[in-house]
Design a protein with these regions (language model features):
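Helix-to-loop junctions at the C-terminal end of transmembrane segments
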Residues: 64-78, 166, 283-297, 384
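A membrane-interface helix-boundary motif in multi-pass transporters
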Residues: 164-182, 384-406
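Multi-pass alpha-helical transporter architecture, strongest
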Residues: 2, 97-100, 183-196, 400-433
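Juxtamembrane intracellular "pre-TM" segments in multi-pass secondary transporters
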Residues: 1-9, 198-238, 430-440
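Intracellular juxtamembrane helix-capping segments at the cytosolic ends
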Residues: 122-135, 340-354
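Cytoplasmic membrane-interface "Motif A"-like loop-to-helix N-cap segments
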Residues: 74-87, 293-308
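Helix-loop boundary and gating motifs at the non-cytosolic
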Residues: 1-64, 232-275
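C-terminal ends and interior cores of transmembrane alpha-helices
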Residues: 87-104, 307-322
């Protein structure tokens, strides 16, 4: 690894430890459990379930504005732009700690969570350009895997600490949040020290794309044009949509059912939905990173997607049998899948994107994540609420729908991987040339 890359890596490693003190508060599973428990009895149950569903899916659907972040950061220094987003997020998370336990407080808390997640989505989108510039393809997955390991372990421990504190006294929330915001400033400082390799060249390429009329736009039609031009990437996005939709449908539904059917409080809910999956990610990240460094992301997803299908199947069985042990098992398998998902989600688009369009490809990717995140909570919780009025085992059928959707995505990756093999074989075949014309 070049000296500049090693220097950047050290600062990113520092940030990966300290920024979770900020992120833990708006981690979708953690904040969903907090809201479900804290506002139970304050508002009507069905309304609370839908608010929890939206908050729990906020990490995904906040990405719907990513194309706007790509446009706003175009032709601008990326690191200072990211620092601005981090500071805005600190302010919003700090406000969450002062929300009253009332209907109005619930809505204000939800608004702060959504705005904070919008800021984090911008950070993730722009960070992909920095990773592409700073880390070469052969080491990129391993480097980002190590960063992800530090982040998720810190998040897992913070989630457990928050759950234990709030089971003891819910008012700890008002002390821990401002404290976490202060600690996270170290992560903001660390990011401010990162240097972008090829910064001048990248800005020149972005300026040239603006002059050629090929710059990112606020108009979502630009996303459609990109997908039309890159059909293989469009196929990848279609399969990701199905797999991701099935996954995103599960978390809001699980948060609701852990409380309503399994009677878990803060600690139990956070363990199943967040801490256990996060703690398992470092186990699988090194293995997934080695695979992703060797193969195209389509071939990677062809294997990896089935782990998500298995996890969804175990959760469905847990609901059918009302067995808590299966919930823990599903959380373990889900965490193993998340390890690979964290790598491929952040890096997969780089197997398709030219250097100066990395943020644009990432913008398309995360915007579509936002679209499915907007659909998923209403689809799963809405299906459960509708079935609960008619049948006894509504939770089983609702999770069965999640399982089937994940399965369709995994099958799609099998088809796409075979198509990619055919394309590679065709491009490797020597082109036929016409025989020379004899001169009479």
């Amino acid at each position: 690894m070049p000296a500049l890359a090693r220097r950047n890596y050290r600062y990113e490693l520092t940030a990966a430890f300290f920024l979770p003190f900020l992120l833990a508060v708006v981690d979708s599973a953690i904040i969903g459990v907090v809201v479900k428990n804290a506002y139970e009895g304050v508002v009507e149950d069905t309304l609370l379930n839908f608010v929890v569903a939206v908050i729990t899916a906020s990490a995904a659907f906040s990405n719907i504005v990513s194309f706007a972040w790509v446009r706003l950061s175009h032709r601008r220094d990326k690191v200072p732009f990211i620092n601005g987003l981090q500071i805005a997020m600190i302010v919003l998370v700090g406000l969450i700690g002062f929300m009253p336990r009332s209907g109005a407080g619930m809505w204000a808390l939800a608004a702060c969570v959504l705005l904070a997640r919008f800021c984090w989505a911008g950070f993730i989108t722009i960070r992909s350009t920095i990773w592409r510039q700073n880390y070469s393809r052969p080491v990129r997955a391993r480097v980002t895997g190590k960063l992800a390991t530090v982040q998720v372990l810190t998040l897992a421990l913070l989630g457990l600490g928050l759950g234990a504190s709030m089971d003891a006294d819910p008012q700890w929330f008002r002390v821990l949040l401002p404290g976490g915001c202060v600690i996270s400033l170290v992560g903001v400082w660390a990011w401010s020290r990162i240097r972008l390799r090829g910064r001048a060249s990248l800005l020149q390429q972005e300026a040239a794309s603006s002059e050629n009329g090929d710059a990112p736009s606020f108009n979502p039609a630009g996303m459609v044009r990109l997908l039309a031009r890159d059909r293989l990437f469009a196929g990848y996005m279609a399969c990701m949509f199905l797999l991701g939709l099935g996954n995103l449908m599960q978390t809001p539904l699980l948060v609701v059912l852990l409380r309503d059917e399994f009677k878990m409080e803060y600690m139990g809910g956070i363990q199943v939905t967040s801490s256990i999956p996060l703690a398992m990610m470092p186990v699988s990240i090194p293995l997934w990173a080695r695979l992703l460094d060797r193969v195209h992301v389509i071939q990677f997803r062809r294997i990896h997607s089935w782990v998500f299908v298995i996890a969804a199947g175990i959760t469905t069985l847990a609901m059918y049998s009302h067995t808590s042990a299966l919930l823990w098992a599903a959380a373990v398998v889900q965490g193993l899948a998340f390890g690979g998902g964290a790598l491929a989600w952040n890096l997969g688009h780089l197997d398709f994107a030219p250097a100066h369009r990395a943020s644009e490809y990432m913008g398309v990717h995360v915007t579509l994540t936002g679209v499915r995140g907007l659909i998923a909570p209403f689809l799963s919780v809405g299906l459960y609420e509708a079935l609960a009025e008619r049948i006894d085992n509504a939770s089983t059928w609702a999770f069965g729908a999640c399982f089937a959707t994940c399965g369709l995505g995994a099958i799609g990756f099998q088809v796409l991987a075979r198509h990619k093999v055919r394309l590679d074989a065709a491009s490797a075949r020597p082109a036929e040339t016409a025989p020379p014309t004899r001169v009479e």
